[in-house]
Regions:
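Bacterial c-di-GMP phosphodiesterase EAL domain
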Residues: 1-24
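EAL-family c-di-GMP phosphodiesterase catalytic domain
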Residues: 5-7, 26, 30-37, 55, ...
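Metal-dependent enolase-superfamily TIM-barrel catalytic cores that perform enediolate-based chemistry
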Residues: 12-16, 27-28, 33-35, 46, ...
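Charged helix-capping and loop-helix junction motifs
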Residues: 13-17, 42-45, 93-100
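Short, flexible, glycine/charge-rich loop motifs used to bind or transfer phosphoryl groups or to couple energy/partner
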Residues: 17-20, 46-47, 68-70
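Short, conserved loop/helix-junction motifs that constitute active-site signature segments
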Residues: 20-23, 50, 74
């Protein structure tokens, strides 16, 4: 669930909302790299409190708007690498060592690293060796709800 500062403020000031949401431990709240105060990491009181109560996900990592501080501070359960970040680098000879360096820096500070932008088989082949926790992209188009069961059984 993508969250904004207004949603964070609501969640942190409404005990009823917190108690309801804590019943659903599978819910994760996503912030983008441009979230206000993100670069302050755990020194941002709202983000620090949110990370205590709920699993947080950092999306669009690599878009260029944030430092590694919030990741190093352990605020995020998951980090999702930015689609454009991947697309800009995937065809370069330096992609493999670059990705290994990024993962070496990020992976110890979260439970999983996800990659977005997997839009064709060529990109898929380039990222498979890195054992990402999950992949996202147009290689797997959206399906109607009634086809999900069939898709999973394939």
């Amino acid at each position: 669930i993508n969250i904004t500062p207004a949603i964070v403020e609501f969640l942190l000031t409404n005990e009823n909302a917190v108690s309801i949401l804590e019943r659903y431990p599978f819910l994760e709240f996503t912030v983008n790299e441009n979230y206000p105060g993100l670069n302050n990491g755990k020194d941002d009181p709202c983000l620090a409190r949110m990370a205590i109560h709920f699993p947080l996900v950092l999306a669009n990592f690599g878009a260029g708007a944030s430092s590694l501080k919030p990741v190093y501070d352990g605020l995020f359960k998951r980090v999702i690498l930015d689609k454009n970040f991947i697309h800009q680098r995937v065809s370069a000879l330096s992609f493999e060592p670059f990705m290994r360096a990024i993962l070496w820096q990020i992976a110890p500070h979260c439970q999983s690293v996800m990659v977005s932008g997997i839009d064709d088989h060529g990109i898929l082949q380039r990222v498979l060796p890195f054992n990402f926790g999950a992949m996202q992209g147009t290689l797997w188009p959206a399906v109607p709800a009634e086809r999900v069961t069939t898709l999973v059984q394939q």
